[in-house]
Amino acid sequence: MRQALPLVTRQGDRIAIVSGLRTPFARQATAFHGIPAVDLGKMVVSELLARSEIPADAIEQLVFGQVVQMPEAPNIAREIVLGTGMNVHTDAYSVSRACATSFQAVANVAESLMAGTIRAGIAGGADSSSVLPIGVSKALARVLVDVNKARTTRQRLTLFSRLRLRDLLPVPPAVAEYSTGLRMGDTAEQMAKTYGITREQQDALAYRSHQRAAQAWAEGKLAEEVMTTYAPPYKNPFSEDNNIRGNSTLADYAKLRPAFDRKHGSVTAANSTPLTDGAAAVILMTESRAKELGLRPLGYLRSYAFTAIDVWQDMLLGPAWSTPLALERAGLTMADLTLFDMHEAFAAQTLANLQLLGSERFARDVLGRAQATGEVDDTKFNVLGGSIAYGHPFAATGARMITQTLHELRRRGGGFGLVTACAAGGLGAAMVLEAE
């Protein structure tokens, strides 16, 4: 094992995560229909600051992400600062790492803390699948640019006459990889076939996710980390994730048809995470700054790792690559973990990563490591359910996982937890957290 890389400031301070909060997550076109991601971000940051009772001017940086970006608000981070009453001098910039976006936001704030340029910051992300940047065809876009430069009405009419009816149709956001044309569901199908993951195994994992998430809500475990929101017309409160199917049965999952490979596939809408709206954020600061403000941290960021692999095959194996690196940098092994939380983009992807984490052959032949990362103990894995149940507002999921894991570690008396996610483009992320 290589030498551990401690995440501390020049003064030896650990990176503390003092608070975390999210909105409830809503299925597309339901509770947050018509509310853009920037407004969801404002909601959660405003409430996070109010609950923490930290002076707004104590926050020196805000790093926020949005995967499905809106042209009218390209820097969501700065809009959140300006729209929440924070000090206008607060540094703010936006990041995007697909489904691992808020992992990246947390890492960026942590790096600023370690560099000594700030002492406290906010990291998070928001996405809306209900408010989308509907575009125009390339032909229409080109004509519109040329029309803007045309000098006469005749020139403008000539340009418009070149268009066909199909050129006027709206163009929804792409769901396929730009470089390959493959949808993430196509890759999930490929991984299911490559690693021998059955439909029954996928449905069982999805069922487990919903049951555990429903139980977590029923036992009140999520109440402290999920805010109550009010959407127009501001009459009905929305305070719990609305995708969780606690009353479903395994037989219900078996009824759905494959969503990607219609003839021979096993990936369905039920064993995949749905399109979702929501936002999440965490407050990070140096350990000494937390003490100055009289705050007890939820926990600490022990290490993190980002990886990238080929996109043509096994694109969603990011956790199998990033997990051993994050553990190594933390000076830990799989056996040292109290909790292991993996983003469930698809049940097939999740099960493939779990399989390869315990594979000596994968470790040796692919990762170039002497031994497997380690089998994931089922009693430690996604103990409160995962993204299949909660939903997946792309940029918010990482912050949800971090906050949820730290709260659960505290309930268990402390220890180490690892959170990890795959992301589009063959990217992966993992973070080791510590709670006392």
Swiss-Prot record:
It comes from the Bacteria. Pathway: Lipid metabolism; fatty acid beta-oxidation. Keywords: Acyltransferase, Cytoplasm, Fatty acid metabolism, Lipid degradation, Lipid metabolism, Transferase. GO terms for molecular function: acetyl-CoA C-acyltransferase activity. Its main location: cytoplasm. It is an enzyme of class 2 (transferase). Belongs to the thiolase-like superfamily. Thiolase family. Catalyzes the final step of fatty acid oxidation in which acetyl-CoA is released and the CoA ester of a fatty acid two carbons shorter is formed. This is 3-ketoacyl-CoA thiolase. It comes from Salmonella arizonae (strain ATCC BAA-731 / CDC346-86 / RSK2980).
